[in-house]
Design a protein with these regions (language model features):
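Active-site helical microenvironments for divalent-metal-assisted chemistry
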Residues: 1-175
């Protein structure tokens, strides 16, 4: 394993150390970025170190006090650029952020599309396995429908990951 990937894991673990996922067990947040890297490497066949590091770091700017300058200092321009492409502007209302994800999905780099695919796969799996306790079945279906809309802009990025995401999206009717 490359030292940069270990550095990204340690960095993300520190940044997310006080955060929990919304699942029933309130699992440590770091499980999510690790899951993305696992999906990319072991299911998508992705070995690109920049993509794997960006997957580990993908929520650091959006959900912690991490700055773009900090990521640049530790991880350089390419990884930081990928992270920025998949980072929502938390100053915007949630519905606007969701709309922009759909609108921008087809315009982001190939590397960012891979991270976005893995993010959607991880989130849908988590919702299926252990959804947030306060989510109704309608809310779960809405999330799956939104993931489908984002997925449409990610086509042509990685056949294996797209197939996994397609199969997960089809399960929305199980709610």
């Amino acid at each position: 394993m490359n030292n940069l990937l270990i550095t990204a894991l340690v960095f993300a673990a520190d940044k997310h150390k006080n955060q929990r996922r919304k699942d029933a067990g309130a699992s440590p947040y770091i499980n999510h970025p690790i899951a993305l890297a696992n999906v990319l490497a072991n299911e998508g066949g992705i070995a690109n170190l920049d993509v794997l590091c960006a997957a580990i770091l993908h929520d650091t700017i959006e959900d912690t006090e991490t700055s773009e300058a900090e990521l640049l200092e530790y991880f350089g321009n390419q990884i930081t650029s990928i992270v920025l492409e998949v980072t929502d502007d938390k100053c915007l209302p949630k519905e606007e952020r969701k709309r922009l994800q759909v609108e921008h999905a087809s315009q982001i780099s190939h590397e960012a599309k891979l991270v976005k695919l893995a993010d959607k796969i991880s989130n849908l799996r988590d919702i299926l396995a252990s959804p947030p306790a306060d989510w109704s079945n309608d809310r779960k279906r809405e999330y799956f429908e939104w993931a489908r809309e984002v997925r449409n802009g990610l086509r042509g990025s990685n056949h294996k990951l797209e197939k996994i995401l397609d199969e997960l999206i089809e399960r929305k009717d199980s709610f």
